[in-house]
Design a protein with these regions (language model features):
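N-terminus-biased targeting/localization segments
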Residues: 5, 20-21
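Conserved small-residue
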Residues: 22-329, 334-338, 344-444
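Bacterial N-terminal signal peptides
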Residues: 8-17
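Bacterial N-terminal signal peptides that target proteins for export
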Residues: 1-8
Length: 444
């Protein structure tokens, strides 16, 4: 595996003097009102200082005994249960989990999408208003746009990497973003859509959250900076697992969606897997799809009863995700600086044709970047976004604004080159391979 990065002027221009104190990353975008009596989000930031994956004996996980190629539903249920354990009991204040610790990525509080103070939710893609004659992405009852918000967290192996990336709070190091085996990332996604728009969300998990206040008649959910306490409902849960058996990418992604028509004593028993994905099916283009080919590096649950639009040509995606992308495709754009568009180029959302999307659906090994000039953050957008949020804040604070790199234009990201022969040893059990301005990280 190789990992391409740039150690040139573009990235180094972001260097700033140290001012902040380790372990004191902000919790939320907005201050807590003095009269607030509800929950208050606290960032879980006591990151492990020792890599749990290197413990003796080596840690084991319940899903490691299950082959996701042949038993995807069993595999992801084992991960789902692992994430639920101890978190439901503390209402997802993951720092208080008595079973195992979980951690939040720093610097997701910044900007107009930043973490709100009640639950730590950040603003996700809004679900657009359906066009005349089309069914809404959230179902046939959807007639208006809906804003969606989410909170993500990682288990101890992932938390260790967060701590390494942010060990110096004034100089976060994206080179440290390479997750060990057993890392699990999870995200709860909520929608502000009302029950008359999404009736299948009856009896789901409901939270109050300080989210954007929309103006009357706003059909596109364009938002300003004003926020207010509103009801949000759990619609989707995303999971990502670092698993070396996923030889295509190093990662297994999965999505659950809520179905109020299912039985069960609690909302978690009505969460249904949409599918499991370990590769991007790079040969599945429009011509192949039209000829009858379908995804082979994903499993899509045949027993879905709630509205699902899936991703490009049937690849895995969740109900609030963009239908022109996929779980893996979206996350493989995680890089610093962000030069690659998070979505493939398109004239407009489907059914209009997507223009040359296939560079976004290659199988990229863990730790690489789509653009050779950037540093990949191993499929983790919260690390890449957090670092760039921090850099923008520091530039504004210090009165310095560097030119921001534009996303890659034209046909798509650059191809990933092979590493050169030079190989000075690194101190992290890997090899750094120097090739001009680029440096590749290669597994021994």
């Amino acid at each position: 595996m190789h990992r391409s990065i740039l150690l040139g002027a573009t990235f180094l221009a972001f260097a700033v003097p140290a001012t902040t104190v380790a372990g004191t990353f902000p919790d939320s975008h907005d201050p807590v009102p003095a009269n607030w009596r509800g929950p208050v989000f606290r960032l879980s930031q006591q990151f492990p200082t020792v890599d749990p994956s290197k413990a003796t004996p080596a840690p084991t996980y319940p899903w490691q005994q299950i082959d996701f190629h042949t038993k995807p539903a069993e595999y992801i249920k084992a991960v789902f249960d692992y994430v639920q354990e101890g978190n439901r009991e503390v209402d997802w204040a993951v720092q208080s989990n008595a079973v195992r610790p979980w951690y939040h990525a720093p610097w997701m509080h910044s900007g107009d999408k930043g973490r709100e103070f009640v639950r730590g939710l950040t603003r996700e893609r809004f679900t657009p208003t359906p066009r005349p004659g089309e069914t809404g992405e959230l179902g046939p009852q959807q007639t208006v746009c809906a804003q969606n918000w989410a909170v993500g967290f990682l288990n101890a192996p992932g938390g260790y990497v967060l701590g390494q990336v942010w060990a110096n709070p004034d100089a976060p190091d994206p080179l440290k973003a390479l997750f060990p085996e057993g890392t699990v990332a999870a995200k709860l996604l909520f929608t502000a859509a009302s029950l008359d728009q999404v009736p299948y969300l009856n009896d789901t998990l409901e939270w109050d959250a300080n989210i954007n206040t929309l103006t009357a008649g706003d059909t596109r959910c364009t938002t300003g900076t004003a926020r207010s306490i509103q009801k949000v409902r759990l619609l989707q849960m995303d999971l990502a697992i670092r698993d070396k058996r996923a030889t295509e990418t190093g990662w297994v992604f999965a999505t659950y969606s809520y179905d109020g028509s299912r039985g069960g004593a609690g909302w978690w028993e009505r969460m249904v897997p949409v599918g499991v994905m370990w590769g991007n099916d790079p040969d599945l283009n429009q011509a192949a799809f039209d000829a009858g080919k379908r995804v082979t590096q994903s499993w899509i649950n045949p027993d879905l009863r709630t509205p699902q639009h899936l991703g490009y040509l049937g690849r895995l995606n969740g109900p609030v995700d963009n239908p022109i992308s996929s779980c893996l495709s979206c996350h493989m754009t995680a890089e610093v600086p962000a030069r690659t568009n998070i979505l493939p180029p398109t004239q407009r959302p489907p059914p209009a044709p997507v223009i040359d999307p296939m560079p976004w659906f290659r199988n990229m090994p863990a730790g690489n970047s789509l653009d050779q000039r950037s540093i990949g953050t191993d499929y983790n957008l919260q690390i890449s976004n957090g670092i760039q949020n921090f850099q923008m804040w520091k530039q504004a604070k210090d009165g310095f604004v560097a030119p921001q790199p534009r996303p890659a234009a034209g046909p798509g990201p650059h191809a990933m080159p092979a590493p050169s022969a030079a190989a000075p040893a690194a101190d992290d059990g890997q090899v750094l391979v120097v090739d001009g301005q680029r440096v590749y990280r290669v597994e021994r």
